[in-house]
Swiss-Prot record:
Binds 1 dipyrromethane group covalently. InterPro entries: HemC, Porphobilin_deaminase_cofac_BS, Porphobilin_deaminase_N, Porphobilinogen_deaminase_C, Porphobilinogen_deaminase_C_sf. It catalyses: 4 porphobilinogen + H2O = hydroxymethylbilane + 4 NH4(+). One of its GO terms (molecular function) is hydroxymethylbilane synthase activity. It comes from Xanthomonas campestris pv. campestris (strain B100). Its EC number is 2.5.1.61. Its cofactor is dipyrromethane. This is Porphobilinogen deaminase. It holds the Pfam family Porphobil_deam. PANTHER family: PORPHOBILINOGEN DEAMINASE (PTHR11557:SF0). Tetrapolymerization of the monopyrrole PBG into the hydroxymethylbilane pre-uroporphyrinogen in several discrete steps. The gene is hemC. One of its GO terms (biological process) is protoporphyrinogen IX biosynthetic process.
């Protein structure tokens, strides 16, 4: 019997996503034994500073990648929005699963919508992208850093530290917490992080056997969308240090990509969009990035 070892973070959401991948692999490969290898990452351990301040979302990957290099795991499961735009050699993403809900969620115990929040309400989020869009919609809000896993963030809200918090819909849904969604923050008015809602599986590119086992899970239509979003982000040199949003959807046989760059300090937002072929996602992403640059994105990004 063949055994496949999946490196995963220890958070409830990461474990859910890894078990979701494991279940799908068992269905596609009867007789395959799939085991999880839970690991702690620096991104999980340092919670008193923003991700931008401690090195970015790549901190969620490094320990898992080292486990693959040491032969302790065969692959790793990630939220694709946490995966850097450029992977270090020899790593590849043979599988991007069908995307979950890409939207953000406003979660509040007292107020039904973003506009219903009282003047100066305390809203928790550490995402610069979310902060920029919150500032644009409600300049009066007091935005407060909020780190930790989904349950930790909800507990901080429930303990009275915030009037509302902003989380990803997909994370709440995957943990059976959809009832906590107070209001959806949806495209086109509110854009998600590039690849938000998508789960990816990473492995060594030089391990053909593992690559082939994983590739059966790849969802082509989702891959086209998130590759266009990530191409735009790459062209902008975006990271968690930069308030960048992107969302691609299918329109007939083409993709429609919306992009945004914002300022978390004053809520200025710049938008651009374009249609393109799903066979030319790099070009589509670059064209939307060019549209953002033409509207002043370079100047805005230089101020960060």
């Amino acid at each position: 019997m063949t055994t496949l070892r999946i490196a995963t973070r220890k958070s409830p959401l990461a474990l859910w996503q890894s078990e979701h991948v494991a279940t799908a692999l068992r269905q596609h490969h009867p007789g395959l034994e799939v085991v999880l290898v839970p690991m702690s990452t620096r991104g999980d351990e340092v919670l008193d500073r923003s991700l931008a301040a401690i090195g970015g979302k790549g901190l969620f990957l490094k320990e898992l990648e080292l486990a693959m290099l040491r032969g302790e795991a065969d692959c790793a499961v990630h939220s694709l929005k946490d995966v850097p735009m450029e992977l270090d050699a020899p790593f590849v993403l043979p599988a991007i699963l069908e995307r979950g809900d890409p939207a953000d969620a406003l979660v509040s115990n007292l107020y039904a919508t973003l506009q219903a929040l009282p003047l100066g309400a305390r809203v928790g989020t550490s995402s610069l992208r979310r902060q920029a869009q919150l500032r644009a919609a409600r300049p009066d809000l007091e935005l407060i850093d909020l780190r930790g896993n989904v349950n930790t963030r909800l507990a901080k809200l429930d303990n009275g530290g915030y009037d509302a918090i902003v989380l990803a819909c997909a994370g709440l849904q995957r943990l059976g917490l959809e009832a906590r969604i107070t209001a959806r923050l949806d495209a086109p008015e509110w854009l998600p992080a590039p690849a938000q809602g998508a789960v990816a599986v990473e492995c060594r590119g030089d391990d053909a056997r593992i690559h082939d086992l994983l590739a059966v899970l790849d969802a082509g239509r989702t891959r086209a969308c998130v590759e266009a979003e990530r191409a735009m982000n790459r062209a902008l040199h975006g990271s968690c240090h930069v308030p960048v949003a992107a969302f691609a959807r299918w329109e007939g046989e083409d993709l429609f990509l919306q992009g945004m760059v914002g300022s978390a300090s004053d809520g200025r937002l710049i938008h651009a969009e374009a249609h393109g072929s799903p066979d030319a996602t790099e070009d589509l992403g670059r064209r939307v990035a060019d549209g953002l640059f033409e509207k002043g994105a370079a100047q805005l990004l230089a101020e960060l």
